[in-house]
């Protein structure tokens, strides 16, 4: 079965072909037009998707060495994301499916991230044997979920203000690192001292709210942004520049330690044997290293997608569509689905 996946939820235009569960192509175009604005401009994102969508889809089909008529299913992100951006891919996919007489499957972008560590592009790819705890962490989302084998999942924690990826980008902008700042902080942090300054870790066992921590798996990163700004305002600009790597390491340590602590605590509380980390921030080397060390300490298996599949991509959309169809979560004639901006958990028992 050949599935075409299309992803346009934010600032990546992507199309991929999944053939019998294996990725045959995954074409991604990351928009550079937002750099000068210090963040994604929704209208520009939509226009870029419109400009690129045809060529990206054609490239994915060509790279997979198939014809359009060889496609069996068309899938696309229905949300969450920037509404205008989502609509470009969604409407294109619906129109293509209708024209070819193929089934159309709308996919929840966050659910696709949750299952992205299990994208198969080589033989022997492993998946958890049982339930697992998933940390989905990106510029727009920070979620902790307990995932069941039948695709049901329970969201047990989410950010109450800023997502972790947003915290990376905005604190990096304060340091003058440009946009996106997350990868730059990751690179600088490798040469810095994470103990240079201890920035706050909200809603953790080491924070002032520790009495209410037990069972609280929500996240908060707005205080970190305020703390970084306060530190910069209280120190000479030249001193801050000289210690840029130390500041990057300290910021990264504050974010990563919270993500790791809560994820491991959730895994132990729910007695699962595996943890997965997905989303754009899962590409962060500090997070990968710290999570692996924590999982090794507690005897947990760790699943993280390849860097190619960490950021937004269409291979995860096609993979999620295949999982939905295999487990009966696909409804025939899904045309006309309304795009949505905010995350809607589809699993049972979610909050």
From Swiss-Prot:
Protease among keywords: no
tRNA processing is among the record's keywords: yes
Superkingdom per UniProt: Bacteria
Gene Ontology, cellular component aspect: cytoplasm
Family: Belongs to the KAE1 / TsaD family.
Lineage: Bacteria, Pseudomonadati, Chlorobiota, Chlorobiia, Chlorobiales
Biological processes, Gene Ontology terms: tRNA threonylcarbamoyladenosine modification
Biological function: Required for the formation of a threonylcarbamoyl group on adenosine at position 37 (t(6)A37) in tRNAs that read codons beginning with adenine. Is involved in the transfer of the threonylcarbamoyl moiety of threonylcarbamoyl-AMP (TC-AMP) to the N6 group of A37, together with TsaE and TsaB. TsaD likely plays a direct catalytic role in this reaction.
Catalytic activity field: L-threonylcarbamoyladenylate + adenosine(37) in tRNA = N(6)-L-threonylcarbamoyladenosine(37) in tRNA + AMP + H(+)
Protein name: tRNA N6-adenosine threonylcarbamoyltransferase
Annotated gene: tsaD
Cofactor binding annotation: Binds 1 Fe(2+) ion per subunit.
């Amino acid at each position: 079965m050949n599935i075409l996946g299309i992803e346009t939820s934010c600032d990546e235009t992507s199309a991929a072909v999944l053939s019998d569960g294996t990725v045959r192509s995954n074409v991604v175009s990351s928009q550079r037009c937002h750099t000068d604005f210090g963040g994604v401009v929704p209208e520009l994102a939509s226009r870029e998707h419109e400009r690129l969508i045809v060529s990206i889809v054609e490239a994915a089909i060509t790279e997979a060495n198939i014809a359009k008529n060889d496609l069996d299913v068309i899938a696309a992100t229905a949300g969450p994301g920037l509404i205008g951006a989502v609509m470009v891919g969604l409407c294109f996919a619906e129109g293509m499916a209708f024209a070819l007489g193929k089934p159309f499957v709308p996919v929840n972008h966050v659910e696709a991230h949750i299952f992205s560590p299990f994208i198969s592009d080589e033989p022997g790819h492993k998946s958890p044997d049982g339930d697992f705890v998933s940390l989905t962490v990106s510029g727009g989302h920070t979620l902790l979920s307990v995932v069941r084998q039948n695709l049901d999942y329970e969201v047990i924690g989410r950010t109450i203000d800023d997502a972790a990826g947003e915290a990376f980008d905005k604190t990096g902008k304060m340091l003058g690192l440009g946009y996106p700042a997350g990868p730059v902080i990751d690179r600088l942090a490798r040469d810095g001292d994470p103990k240079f300054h201890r920035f706050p870790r909200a809603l953790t066992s080491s924070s002032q709210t520790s009495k209410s921590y037990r069972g609280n798996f929500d996240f908060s990163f707005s205080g970190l942004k305020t703390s970084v700004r306060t530190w910069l305002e209280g120190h000479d600009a030249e001193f801050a520049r000289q210690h840029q790597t130390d500041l990057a390491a300290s910021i990264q340590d504050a974010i990563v330690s919270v993500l790791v602590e809560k994820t491991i605590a959730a895994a132990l509380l729910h007695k699962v044997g595996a943890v997965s980390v997905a989303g754009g921030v899962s590409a962060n080397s500090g997070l990968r290293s710290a999570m692996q060390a924590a999982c090794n300490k507690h005897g947990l298996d760790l699943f993280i997608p390849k860097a190619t599949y960490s950021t937004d991509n269409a291979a995860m959309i096609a993979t999620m569509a295949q999982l939905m169809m295999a487990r009966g979560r696909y409804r025939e004639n899904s045309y006309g689905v309304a795009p949505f901006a905010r995350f809607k958990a589809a699993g049972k028992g979610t909050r």
